[in-house]
């Protein structure tokens, strides 16, 4: 097996820095990310029937995902502020989990995978927040609630 040493573009002499993208061309870019939250059967039924105390779980999670995408550079230090030209948020209810897919588009100098990942993460955290009273056990903990499989599904450039 041959190992190729890779260098990190955001680290120079052990100092983190934002990469200069001034010379890059503006091109159409897209990233799609996904993840899921595992919930109890009782909570899943409340989501299905629209009886969650805090309100519409999916509507709230969609808005939260959009806001998170737009705020990504405020929470990820080396992420560039780029114009977001489109955001799609899809939430689906499964047997024991809710899945989220966030697609982000831009015409810019750098990709939008961090924005898509941030959108998915915040959508799932918002679902958790909306249903946490139903998910808590008698000690106030969440023994079965689990966010998992957050990943980039696709990234396109050009």
Curated annotation (Swiss-Prot):
Stated name of the protein: Probable cyclic pyranopterin monophosphate synthase
Q: Does the keyword Lyase apply?
A: yes
Highest taxon of the lineage: Archaea
Catalytic activity reads: (8S)-3',8-cyclo-7,8-dihydroguanosine 5'-triphosphate = cyclic pyranopterin phosphate + diphosphate
Tell me the InterPro entries matching this sequence.
Answer: Mo_CF_biosynth-C_arc, MoaC, MoaC_sf, Mopterin_CF_biosynth-C_dom
Q: What EC number(s) is this enzyme filed under? A: 4.6.1.17
Subunit info here reads:
Homohexamer; trimer of dimers.
Q: One Pfam family name from the record?
A: MoaC
Q: Which species is the source of this protein?
A: Methanosarcina acetivorans (strain ATCC 35395 / DSM 2834 / JCM 12185 / C2A)
User: What's its job?
Assistant: Catalyzes the conversion of (8S)-3',8-cyclo-7,8-dihydroguanosine 5'-triphosphate to cyclic pyranopterin monophosphate (cPMP).
Family to which the UniProt record says this protein belongs: Belongs to the MoaC family.
Q: Does the keyword Disulfide bond apply?
A: no
